[in-house]
Amino acid sequence: MTIDTRQLGRVDYLPTYQAMQDFTAARNEATPDALWICEHPAVYTQGLAGKIDHLLNPGEIPVVQTNRGGQVTFHGPGQVVVYPLIDLKRAGYFVKEYVYRIEESVIRTLAHFGVTGHRVAGSPGIYVRMDDPFSHAALSGPVHPSDPFRGLGKIAALGIKVSRHCTYHGVALNVAMDLEPFSRINPCGYAGLKTTDLSTIGVSASWQEAASVLGQKLATYLAP
């Protein structure tokens, strides 16, 4: 069964969040899986593990409490957000592999633009070397005991929810954003974690191009 890919454009977060929940509650064994690709106006979203003290200074940017895993993150213009709505039972893999496949899709998307993405154990999402994001060298050596992200910038965030073996929420890839709002939070609960985007590391890519590539990679890697 093919994945139904939908380009939603720029849409408010709250109605999209509600639509994901409604889709998941209403779907049955015959419902095709879907990828919703969109962009949101500026908003902070809190995951179930989120702590209020990680919201340092949200200012006028709204904060939405959600039921996804993880902690606080920021969505805004210039970021590609993809919500995979996948029946894991039908797909034939479990949550851990699902997360791995999403991360692999981001890594392959970055590779399309010549950038090397990295995983950090225990910290879902994808990171790049800030000193040389195009280096193919693997991360090596022990991580710094007090700063496992030293030298890295987070370029993609991941947060999911699984209900009746069906997924919603998803992944956000930073393309060309105003990164200042990330400085007002501890991204994903980590104080001082640097956040970056493709533009900052020297990649000139349009939102539409990045969205198209990421959508294609997810459709490929999330297939059964």
From Swiss-Prot:
Pathway: Protein modification; protein lipoylation via endogenous pathway; protein N(6)-(lipoyl)lysine from octanoyl-[acyl-carrier-protein]: step 1/2. GO terms for cellular component: cytoplasm. The record marks 154 as: Lowers pKa of active site Cys. Its EC number is 2.3.1.181. Keywords: Acyltransferase, Cytoplasm, Transferase. CDD domains: LipB (cd16444). PROSITE patterns: BPL_LPL_CATALYTIC (PS51733), LIPB (PS01313). Signal peptide: none annotated. In the reaction, the free carboxyl group of octanoic acid is attached via an amide linkage to the epsilon-amino group of a specific lysine residue of lipoyl domains of lipoate-dependent enzymes. HAMAP family: LipB. This is Octanoyltransferase. The gene is lipB.
